[in-house]
Design a protein with these regions (language model features):
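DE-rich acidic low-complexity regions and acidic surface loops
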Residues: 1-168
Length: 168
């Protein structure tokens, strides 16, 4: 079975004996050298490989390391849960919307994230620790009666995406 665990800056291939490396799409020699050096310092065990993704070009090394650490912990948890479980059972959910937000949009440049649902906000805070080197943003629970999208003026632009009429 071919397993791949995607992170923001890397993809972990736990049952793959290839060496992995830096994405072929990264053509700048300085970027390739920096990322290759970082990749080689991960000391992957035999039978495991890692590919550094193109969006790692602009990332800080500590963020790439945090991404890799998260993927290693995730793989360890998946293996342990698999050994303890009786099939069929869901072992891990990797692409839920909240996981995608925490993994893909957890950037240093984002100043604030607003949640209308308290349960989702708490889950995000837990996930943020896995995906981020430092929590650098304001996380707010929106409590007003006016719906969140209306309050921020984004309801109409979103609704227009589903309109059947195209105005030229």
């Amino acid at each position: 079975t071919f397993i791949s665990l995607p992170g923001r800056y890397s993809v972990l291939l736990p049952n793959n004996s290839s060496t992995g490396g830096v994405s072929k799409k990264i053509s700048n020699p300085l970027d390739r050298k920096r990322l290759k050096k970082l990749h080689d310092n991960f000391n992957l065990p035999d039978g495991m490989s890692l590919i550094i993704r193109t969006n790692a070009i602009s990332a800080e090394d500590e963020d790439i390391i945090a991404d890799f650490s998260y993927l290693r912990k995730l793989w360890t948890k998946i293996r342990e849960d698999t050994l303890k479980s009786k099939a069929p059972i869901l072992i891990a959910e990797l692409d839920t919307p909240i996981i995608k937000v925490a993994r893909d949009f957890n950037q240093r440049t984002i100043e604030e994230i607003v949640f209308s649902d308290l349960k989702t906000m708490k889950l995000y805070k837990k996930l943020e620790k896995d995906f981020s080197v430092k929590a650098n943003k304001k996380i707010t629970h929106y409590k007003d009666k006016l719906p969140l999208f209306e309050s921020y003026g984004i309801k109409n632009p979103i609704n227009s995406l589903t309109e059947e009429n195209i105005y030229l």
